[in-house]
């Protein structure tokens, strides 16, 4: 997974950070470690060695700028070269809110195209657009039902043919007529093809018929550097209106390979899928991506995620925690925030210094566990939530019966509470929590509450 890549690169850089003296031998040793980490992530060997030469040349022969130590200069060189590897500048999906924007989503079978259609609709909905979805994939049995469930969840209109008696062209034509008042129409095209040639032929037909503003190729991140072939064929076929969305970046050891392979041929990567939830789609920005990978954080994305969640309850709980109070009530509020904002691991990766330093277990909570923990806490008394230390065997039996769980699961919750409390106390003394103004407030809020 990508967190392993980030951890491996950070372990290499820590040799620089912790060294009393940085010489040529140490630089070469660190570069070898970085090479190994990238190759394990399925980044093309030629790209890795070309990047390594640049790092070595600059680290050994360049003088550090004024105000920057030799160590920091080398770390910045590594950061800059990794950003170059992924294309340097992020590219946004530009749409005209005054006109109807048609977006075609195409992809090989199993790429995650249908889920990505809903995620993209949700992303554009949050940007103020009025998107609609057209389910034109009539070949995969569950495609329509899947998109229907997702669209209902995010309250976005959908047109499709559950009977599967119409062609993709007919469904799309009907949908475009139906959604005259919507400014973005996302078409989930037929994903019947297992090879690029068939997919590109279908895409060409749809392009000629419906004249889309954007065609997005959905690529499975687990392909690693093999993604290059799909991206190149696509780029050559669509000229200047195509972009790439890479899925499964949260669970693929080859995600870095897929990103670098696509960036190598100059195909614009505009989005990456970072999880299973409908909100787990992010605009791709190489600088932000590498910042998170190296534990430097991503404050811009952090602010975006916190924009809509600061309310009175959040403020009250935040104030309590900043006074040193962290009970199960505060944990409950935190878990509710996670369900709104994404996984704790993703959120912590946006905080400088936290992506790679989070205590083991502090971010290890699945959606299933989150719901179960909340049920357990709902079965506790106010006194128990305020004073978790009093929860012994007899109380556990009563709580377990009320929540319909095993006592072991209550112990697991209490252990998670203890780990999270320790993480909070460790970070409470950090600079992030001492920041003033709106930024400091949001940073504190995001880390420990809502």
From Swiss-Prot:
| Localization | Cytoplasm
Query: One Pfam family name from the record?
Result: SRP54
The source's domain of life comes to Archaea
Q: According to its UniProt record, which reaction does this protein catalyse?
A: GTP + H2O = GDP + phosphate + H(+)
What GO biological process terms does the UniProt entry carry, in alphabetical order? SRP-dependent cotranslational protein targeting to membrane
Q: Which UniProt keyword terms apply here?
A: Cytoplasm, GTP-binding, Hydrolase, Nucleotide-binding, Ribonucleoprotein, RNA-binding, Signal recognition particle
Query: What EC numbers are recorded for this enzyme?
Result: 3.6.5.4
- Hydrolase as a keyword of this entry, yes or no, is yes
GO MF annotation list:
7S RNA binding; ATP hydrolysis activity; GTP binding; GTPase activity
RNA-binding listed as a keyword: yes
State the GO CC annotations: signal recognition particle
EC supergroup of this enzyme: hydrolase
InterPro entries cross-referenced by the UniProt entry? AAA+_ATPase, P-loop_NTPase, Signal_recog_part_SRP54_M_sf, Signal_recog_particl_SRP54_hlx, Signal_recog_particle_SRP54_M, SRP/SRP_N, SRP54, SRP54_GTPase_dom
Q: Which residues bind GTP?
A: 107-114, 188-192, 247-250
Q: Which family does it belong to?
A: Belongs to the GTP-binding SRP family. SRP54 subfamily.
Entry's PANTHER family?
SIGNAL RECOGNITION PARTICLE 54K PROTEIN SRP54 (PTHR11564), SIGNAL RECOGNITION PARTICLE SUBUNIT SRP54 (PTHR11564:SF5)
Summarize the subunit comment.
Part of the signal recognition particle protein translocation system, which is composed of SRP and FtsY. Archaeal SRP consists of a 7S RNA molecule of 300 nucleotides and two protein subunits: SRP54 and SRP19.
In the record's own words, the domains note is:
Composed of three domains: the N-terminal N domain, which is responsible for interactions with the ribosome, the central G domain, which binds GTP, and the C-terminal M domain, which binds the RNA and the signal sequence of the RNC.
Q: What is the documented function of this protein? A: Involved in targeting and insertion of nascent membrane proteins into the cytoplasmic membrane. Binds to the hydrophobic signal sequence of the ribosome-nascent chain (RNC) as it emerges from the ribosomes. The SRP-RNC complex is then targeted to the cytoplasmic membrane where it interacts with the SRP receptor FtsY.
Which protein are we looking at? Signal recognition particle 54 kDa protein
Give the organism the record lists: Methanococcus aeolicus (strain ATCC BAA-1280 / DSM 17508 / OCM 812 / Nankai-3)
- Per the record, the gene is srp54
